[in-house]
Amino acid sequence: MSIILGIDPGSRITGYGVIRQQGRHLQYLGSGCIRTSEKELPGRLKQIYAGVTEIITQFQPDVFAIEQVFMAKNADSALKLGQARGSAIVAAVNADLPVYEYAARLIKQAVVGTGGADKVQVQHMVQHMLKLPAKPQADAADALGVAICHANTNKTLVALAGKASSARKGRYR
């Protein structure tokens, strides 16, 4: 059994999703969004760190999975996204959680079956896979998708290696 915290980082809205993986079964534990209110980036980064720390304290995950930075058309946006990811990752590392990263296309492939899926498709499939009564918010659905991707990737690694791979574990320690 493993509790997985998935993060969809953003400098204004950071989605989170928590699931429990027990064999092939995935159970929804919680999800939502950390919405930053500060005008300046350093204040928003502090809010992201505090929010992720609070979620870790509440759910006590075993694993932290986060979406990788993609190349944005706007370099400033990509830098801010990278800094938001950093705030979330530091919260995970401070809690001694192993950190795993997944590309957006891989996450969409794991959840929807195609790397080019849109947010609505991800929301629909996350709702279906976790048997949720309603579609989660877009950023929360993306974060749940990160957690589902990790669960599916971990199952594949276990099947291939006979045990969980630690190749990416502790990357930020």
Curated annotation (Swiss-Prot):
Domain of life: Bacteria
Residues annotated as binding Mg(2+) 2: E67
EC identifiers of the protein: 3.1.21.10
Cellular location(s): Cytoplasm
Cofactor note: Binds 2 Mg(2+) ion per subunit.
Main location: cytoplasm
GO molecular function: crossover junction DNA endonuclease activity; DNA binding; magnesium ion binding
Catalytic reactions of this protein: Endonucleolytic cleavage at a junction such as a reciprocal single-stranded crossover between two homologous DNA duplexes (Holliday junction)
UniProt KW Electron transport keyword: no
Record's keyword terms, sorted: Cytoplasm, DNA damage, DNA recombination, DNA repair, DNA-binding, Endonuclease, Hydrolase, Magnesium, Metal-binding, Nuclease
Binding site for Mg(2+) 1: D8, D139
Positions of the catalytic residues: D8, E67, D139
Protein family: Belongs to the RuvC family.
Self-association state and partner proteins as the record states: Homodimer which binds Holliday junction (HJ) DNA. The HJ becomes 2-fold symmetrical on binding to RuvC with unstacked arms; it has a different conformation from HJ DNA in complex with RuvA. In the full resolvosome a probable DNA-RuvA(4)-RuvB(12)-RuvC(2) complex forms which resolves the HJ.
Role, per record: The RuvA-RuvB-RuvC complex processes Holliday junction (HJ) DNA during genetic recombination and DNA repair. Endonuclease that resolves HJ intermediates. Cleaves cruciform DNA by making single-stranded nicks across the HJ at symmetrical positions within the homologous arms, yielding a 5'-phosphate and a 3'-hydroxyl group; requires a central core of homology in the junction. The consensus cleavage sequence is 5'-(A/T)TT(C/G)-3'. Cleavage occurs on the 3'-side of the TT dinucleotide at the point of strand exchange.
Record protein name field: Crossover junction endodeoxyribonuclease RuvC
Organism, as annotated: Vibrio parahaemolyticus serotype O3:K6 (strain RIMD 2210633)
